[in-house]
UniProtKB/Swiss-Prot annotation:
Disruption phenotype: Show reduced level of ethylene production, suppressed zyg1 expression thus resulting in inhibition of zygote formation and impaired macrocyst formation. This is 1-aminocyclopropane-1-carboxylate oxidase. The keyword Chloroplast does not apply. It holds the Pfam family 2OG-FeII_Oxy. Residues 191-226 are annotated as: Disordered. Residues 211-223 have a biased composition (Basic and acidic residues). Pathway: Alkene biosynthesis; ethylene biosynthesis via S-adenosyl-L-methionine; ethylene from S-adenosyl-L-methionine: step 2/2. Keywords: Dioxygenase, Ethylene biosynthesis, Iron, Metal-binding, Oxidoreductase. It comes from the Eukaryota. 2-oxoglutarate binds at R298.
Amino acid sequence: MEIDIEKLPIIDISSFQNNENDKNQVAKEINKACKEYGFFYIKNHGVDQELIENLQNVIKKFFSLPLEIKMKWKMGLTNREWLGFFKVGQEITYGQVDWKEGCYYSSEMDGDINTIHNVPLYPTAEQEEQYEIQGFKSTIHTYIEKLTHLSQQIIEAISLSLNLPQDYFFKNYTYDPFILMGLLHYPSFHHQEQEEEQEDDESNNGGKKSPNPDESKKPEVEKFGTGQHTDWGLLTVLYQDDVGGLQVKSKNSEEYIDAPPIPGTFICNIGDMLDKMTGGYYLSNLHRVKYNKSGRDRFSIPFFLDPSLNSIPKLIPNYDQLSQFADKPERWDKQNIHEFDGTYGQYFIKKIGRVFPDYVYKKSGELV
């Protein structure tokens, strides 16, 4: 089902830099979007298109490298075990394998992270030259810098949308934000699917279907590029290429609706912590990525602006409007985010340990 893009508003975020009336209009639009879908597009965001294209080009080159080369920078080689490269099948979303490969990076530089056997998180300058991925590290960090600035601006607009001081979230949570950025590659499995269907046909009684329904193969679990989930932190700002594949849960039913790429925009969504802080007034909505059978590889770049790891996310105080919108005690994943009372770092490590069980330490729920 294709979405009517009027339902996911396209907000001109540049207006937030104008007068108070324009700021209030942006805040009003964000309020409506966060209550209804938890998703919205932004345009005129100020991130140079050339930077986006440069990043997209260099990550395409990186993912085209042989697997054994990409594994030089695999996850688990630093004390931030979730940073680095992972191959198809290693990321798990709520018990189901995701059909993608990717890398996760943060704002931390190599010198800020303890490495194992002196293996750097990023390719060295010599390796960038050797594997023809020049500018890989520098382009990533320039993008992180620009997206951090943009995301802080969006968080200010979200503050105003809740009738809070513009710097409310900055003072309490994003003064030292936890930044995570993904470079995601969804290979096209179009030809593989065709081959599997042909093999199935040939294996059924010499190419003939069995007349007995009981002998037919049981239906397989539906595959996804990324399974249904909600994001964990405050805000996600996503760049997706023109292949598309993102789907968002409808506000009117249990169905999912397409959230297609729109040139010149990012798509934003709020996470569990903002849902928790607003008592369910703002929605951390389910979304997923379709299994890629398009015949073209898909690339996306999610950027996560999350609370400081040492901060303790709390319900916004003295905000009576929120109580009437409280979430149900249990969500779709049988979790109650409103009962969680630890630091964001504890919440994150618990979540990431389920997504990458092969890599993440389980040391009393603490970041190490």
